[in-house]
């Protein structure tokens, strides 16, 4: 039996993907059956971190070592990730959501539709307010765009109004939100998005 939803979380290195996965797990684990697959190039660091902080029970977390280009393992040849997801779904037949966190990649990264149903793409303010207008599949076609670390805008000279304008122009009607995952600001918007995607919402 497959889970109700396979949700990809992608974005550049350091944007806050693992922080978002951790926050979603902590907030939803008491009302949904969750599992996580993480991707790292040569380690299982993100999986080990999520286990160490107790985001979920260890047996619900799988770490995939992709080697080479991280986008290949979520797009061109996603077999290693698909196997990890299917293993979790066999072990936990009542799963509601499997979160698949990609390795850190560039703005061109995207998930294979064979691997996930929907994708959240995470960027961060520290990379500069020009990022939304640079485009790329993550910016323009992800199901939800998360612009994280808004608390750093004043320190890096990023203009949130410019980011808002450019994001709206690039995405049209597709949803997006600002977050500061360290404080929890904006997390409710992400959780609302996820819950709205479930066939039978709790």
Swiss-Prot record:
What UniProt keywords are attached to this protein's entry?
Chaperone, Cytoplasm, GTP-binding, Nickel insertion, Nucleotide-binding
Under the heading CDD domains, the entry gives: UreG (cd05540)
One GO biological-process annotation of the entry reads:
urea catabolic process
Q: Which Pfam families match?
A: cobW
Coiled-coil residues: none
Q: Binding of GTP: at which residues?
A: 11-18
Q: Output one GO MF annotation.
A: GTP binding
Q: Which InterPro entries match?
A: CobW/HypB/UreG_nucleotide-bd (IPR003495), P-loop_NTPase (IPR027417), UreG (IPR004400)
Which GO cellular component does the record give, naming just one? Answer: cytoplasm
Cellular compartments annotated: Cytoplasm
**Quaternary structure and interacting proteins, as annotated:** Homodimer. UreD, UreF and UreG form a complex that acts as a GTP-hydrolysis-dependent molecular chaperone, activating the urease apoprotein by helping to assemble the nickel containing metallocenter of UreC. The UreE protein probably delivers the nickel.
Name the job this protein performs.
Answer: Facilitates the functional incorporation of the urease nickel metallocenter. This process requires GTP hydrolysis, probably effectuated by UreG.
Q: Could you say which protein family the record assigns here? A: Belongs to the SIMIBI class G3E GTPase family. UreG subfamily.
Which NCBIfam families does the record cross-reference, listed alphabetically? ureG
**In its UniProt entry, what is this protein called?**
Urease accessory protein UreG
Q: Which organism is it from?
A: Prochlorococcus marinus (strain MIT 9313)
